Amino acid sequence: MELGELYESLGLGQAARVEYDLLRERARDAEEAGANEALTLGRLEADHGDPAEAVRLLRVEWGRQPGTAVADALGWALHRTGEDEEALEFATIATDGDKGGGVRSALHVFHRGVIERALERTGPARRHLREALTLNPYFSPLRVPEAKRLLAELGEPPVEGPPG
């Protein structure tokens, strides 16, 4: 998927689609051989295919394996289908330091920030988009420019003095 996203970031849409189609084919072949590729296919469909299909796949996977990677992917797929309130519940799980063993993912934090922005929660959105770029300023050739653009749109928080 990363190669497709690199191609997409370079404006090579046809080459990106070839990579996404190849990934779908390989994941389906692996499933026929007994592997579970629901997370891979769900992530792919959420961003580069059918988000509703991603939600379907990832809900089943969540029931089987409720980990942080699945929580992130399901939250993102829900966001992509317009279900932002439920999406935030899963994004919060995916970015919970205790549930993730203390590991922070720039992509997971980015997803949470985008979902919060969609819900007009500008303070948390700004904080999480900034955190994603701080954790890894190169986490995605597609998402880093988006995070920077969204931060610019959100602007700086208002400066308020003490009450009184």
Please give the residue ranges for each predicted region:
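Generic helix N-cap/helix-start motif at coil->alpha-helix transitions
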Residues: 1-2, 30-40, 65-72, 102-109
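Alpha-helical junction/boundary sensor with strong preference for TPR arrays
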Residues: 26-30, 65, 98-101, 136, ...
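Structural motif corresponding to the intra-repeat A-B loop/turn of tetratricopeptide repeats
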Residues: 10, 48-49, 81, 119, ...
